Curated annotation (Swiss-Prot):
Binding-site residues, Mg(2+) 2: D92, D96
E.C. number: 2.5.1.-, 2.5.1.1, 2.5.1.29, 2.5.1.10
Induction details: The subglutinol cluster is highly expressed when mycelia and hyphae are transferred to fresh media for a 3 hour induction period, remaining expressed under conditions of heat shock. The cluster is repressed in cultures reaching stationary phase or in early germinating cultures, as well as under conditions of UV, salt and oxidative stress.
Residues that coordinate or bind dimethylallyl diphosphate: R101, K179, T180, Q219, N226, K236, K246
Described function: Geranylgeranyl pyrophosphate synthase; part of the gene cluster that mediates the biosynthesis of the immunosuppressants subglutinols, meroterpenoids consisting of an alpha-pyrone (4-hydroxy-5,6-dimethyl-2-pyrone) moiety attached to a decalin core fused to a five-membered cyclic ether carrying a prenylside chain. The first step of the pathway is the synthesis of the alpha-pyrone moiety by the polyketide synthase subA via condensation of one acetyl-CoA starter unit with 3 malonyl-CoA units and 2 methylations.
UniProt-annotated binding residues for Mg(2+) 3: D222
Residues at the site labelled Important for determining product chain length: Y124
Family to which the UniProt record says this protein belongs: Belongs to the FPP/GGPP synthase family.
Protein's name in the database: Geranylgeranyl pyrophosphate synthase subD
Recorded superkingdom: Eukaryota
Cofactor: how and how many bound: Binds 3 Mg(2+) ions per subunit.
PROSITE patterns registered for this protein in UniProt: POLYPRENYL_SYNTHASE_1, POLYPRENYL_SYNTHASE_2
Organism: Metarhizium robertsii (strain ARSEF 23 / ATCC MYA-3075) (Metarhizium anisopliae (strain ARSEF 23))
Disruption phenotype: Results in faster growth and increased resistances to heat and UV stress. Also leads to increased virulence using S.furcifera as the insect host.
């Protein structure tokens, strides 16, 4: 018989048939797996215990001033967003070859890449497991739509970096809307779904446009701080976006402001860790007025967000002050942060 030919006796053998676990056997296997829960979650829990600003949780609490969600459902939504946000950070750090997260070594440098990827994927499904608690099957639809959106945005960002292709600002805004805006939208859409004011929200006002603007402000500010903030240097390392080869907002503006100067584009391709080279790149970005452009764009978007908040405050019962405070948290003049 040929070595590649199937053994019919083996194919028909009942020993090879997969049988469902039942009774004590099922309980035993479940108990064994449960004993590994802490190990499986270790990369995730390590990241979770690092200090952070918890902007997304504060945003959820702020919007609840308008939406009045029952406390149990509000905690479910916060947990879903927390799980997804931290899972995405685990994957981001691997894809970006990051070394620091919040001032300490990234998870995959401690637990290894395979275990960290598994922990991140595990967290995605822990989040999905929470959805039935919201009591509406549409929650699954929202969850799927926004996770697909998040991965589309991440794919665009990775493609530009790996292909050394500088996007336009319009393409950048589209990417941010998908990637950064995805979790913001997921939170608010689930909140609208669970709100005691559901009838009012769906028939008169939609909070998603405001959340989209907040997401863009958050990302541009983050891009600015990556290259200009001392605190960011302590937490993530100096000019990490340059080492990563990332087309961030100030870098895109700088390259497109002077297409004949290939110095900045060339530095991005090098994935440099040399501080002197990165300092030179920062000077190139300054020379094209790109940091000022960032601040102007942030100010423009903050004004747009405040107008949307004002309109919401005039038409939706509840206080707008909490949302204003979240805007202050993510939209202050970058140099003061």
């Amino acid at each position: 018989m040929s070595p590649s030919a199937p053994n019919t006796n083996e194919l028909n053998s009942p020993v090879l048939e997969t049988q469902p676990l039942a009774g004590d056997a099922a309980l035993l296997h479940s108990s064994i797996a449960a004993g590994y829960e802490e190990i499986i979650r270790a990369p995730f829990d390590y990241l979770l215990n690092l200090p952070g600003k918890d902007v997304r949780s504060k945003m959820i609490s702020a919007f609840n001033e308008w939406l009045c969600i029952p406390a149990d459902k509000l905690e479910v939504i916060k947990r879903i967003v927390m799980l997804l946000h931290n899972a995405s950070l685990l994957i981001d750090d691997i894809q970006d070859s990051s070394k620091l997260r919040r001032g300490l070594p990234v998870s995959h440098h401690i637990f290894g890449v395979p275990q960290t990827i598994n922990a991140a994927n595990y967290a995605y499904f822990l989040a999905q497991q929470e959805l039935p608690k919201l009591g509406d099957p549409k929650a699954f639809e929202i969850y799927t739509e926004e996770l697909l959106s998040l991965h589309r945005g991440q794919g665009m960002d990775i493609y530009w970096r790996e292909a050394s292709k500088c996007p336009t600002e319009e393409e950048y805004f589209s990417m941010v809307s998908h990637k950064t805006g995805g979790l913001f939208r997921l939170a608010i859409r689930l909140m609208q779904l669970a709100s005691d004011k559901n009838w009012f929200v769906f028939h008169t006002r939609d909070f998603v446009p405001l959340v989209n603007v907040l997401g863009v402000i958050f990302q541009i500010r983050d891009d600015y701080l990556n290259l200009q903030s001392h605190a960011y240097t302590v937490n993530k390392g100096f000019g990490e976006d340059l080492t990563e080869g990332k087309y961030s907002f100030p870098i895109i503006h700088s390259i497109r402001s002077d297409p004949t100067n290939i110095q900045l584009s060339s530095i991005l391709k090098q994935r440099t860790t040399d501080v002197d080279v990165k300092l030179f790149a920062v000077e190139c970005i300054k020379a094209t007025g790109s940091f000022e452009h960032c601040k102007e764009k942030i100010a423009e978007l903050v004004a747009e967000a405040r107008q949307l908040i004002k309109e919401m405050g005039n038409s939706v019962p509840g206080s707008a002050e909490a949302v204003d405070r979240v805007l202050d948290l993510i939209g202050l003049e970058p140099e003061s942060s």
